[in-house]
């Protein structure tokens, strides 16, 4: 991160694609050390499932209401944003309610998810992403958010979905350039055509999917969010280190490592391996 005493020039920043609005967004979502310590509260499906399970434990068998989901997101933002550089929110439940309730501090950055949660899929179960209904990059910029986040599942070996996702990512990237707002792109591998996450064919190709996705897509963002290229305990540590080096080489932008739902000890080891590689 640049500071008044550094030698990083405006020309250098522009060469990295950091125009004034993007640079300001990066500063806003980082802490004083230039570290990204973001909290995600935009996961609608998993949050709805958690609230539904909580209600069942209380003997109430029903779907959570809009108000209950909003309340849960406000509680999360209030509790966790105090120790975060930024909070990631969704447009439907989170952004206005979290900000309007004054539970996101004025010194905490705000990122808004642009993609639709639980969008359509093709005949083999591969995602076909699109904008959150009623939302756009322009709207996210206009409400004063600091950055846009785009989650785009991507599988190079499934051409129908891959072509659709590629075009959608390009569109969001161009919109972010037009409106001068920072873009964080998150690509994830996915099972399709009857696979599950523990299916051997998915496990076997995941590392290559992660690396190839970075090679094709990392140019269309300012910060790239990548999955760990492999599985702890499946591939050897030496193979995983090789995969991480290939991922680093493939990514055309600074990248961060997604936790992708693993527990903290596993994620800690993944981060340590990524740093060493």
Locate each region found by the language model:
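Alpha-helix N-cap and loop-to-helix initiation/capping positions
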Residues: 60, 64, 68, 127-128, ...
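Conserved anion-binding
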Residues: 154-158, 165-220
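Alpha-helix-loop-beta-strand connector modules within alpha/beta enzyme cores
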Residues: 102-117, 165-185, 206, 238-257
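Catalytic-face loop-and-helix region of soluble metabolic enzyme cores
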Residues: 223-277
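Alpha/beta catalytic barrel-like cores
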Residues: 1-141, 146, 151-157, 220, ...
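Conserved, mostly hydrophobic/aromatic
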Residues: 39, 186, 224
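Catalytic beta/alpha-barrel core
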Residues: 87-91, 149-153, 158-161, 204-239, ...
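Alpha-helical scaffolding segments of alpha/beta enzyme cores, especially the outer helices
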Residues: 71, 75, 135-138, 164-178, ...
């Amino acid at each position: 991160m640049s500071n008044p005493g550094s030698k990083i020039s405006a020309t250098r920043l522009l060469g990295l694609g950091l125009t004034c609005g993007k640079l300001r967004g990066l500063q806003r979502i980082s802490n004083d050390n230039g570290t990204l310590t973001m909290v995600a509260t935009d996961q609608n499906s998993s949050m709805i499932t958690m609230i539904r399970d909580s209600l069942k434990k209380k003997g109430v068998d029903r779907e959570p209401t809009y108000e209950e989901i909003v309340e849960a997101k406000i509680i999360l933002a209030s509790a966790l944003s105090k120790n975060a550089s930024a909070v990631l929110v969704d447009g439907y439940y989170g952004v206005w309610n979290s900000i309007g309730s004054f539970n996101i501090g004025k010194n905490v950055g705000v990122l808004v998810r642009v993609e639709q949660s639980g969008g359509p899929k093709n005949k083999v179960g591969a995602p076909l992403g699109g904008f959150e209904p009623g939302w756009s990059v322009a709207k996210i910029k206009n409400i004063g958010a600091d950055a846009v986040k785009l989650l785009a599942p991507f599988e190079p070996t499934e051409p129908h979905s891959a072509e659709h996702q590629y075009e959608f990512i390009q569109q969001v990237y161009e919109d972010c350039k037009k409106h001068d707002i920072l873009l964080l792109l998150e690509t994830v591998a996915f099972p399709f055509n009857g696979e599950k996450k523990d299916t051997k064919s998915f496990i076997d190709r995941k590392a290559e999917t992660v690396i190839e996705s970075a090679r094709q897509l990392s140019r269309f963002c300012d910060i790239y969010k990548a999955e760990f290229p492999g599985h702890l305990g499946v591939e050897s540590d030496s193979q995983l280190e090789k995969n991480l080096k290939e991922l680093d080489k493939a990514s055309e932008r600074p990248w961060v490592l997604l936790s992708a739902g693993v527990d903290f000890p596993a994620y800690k080891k993944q981060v340590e391996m990524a740093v060493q590689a």
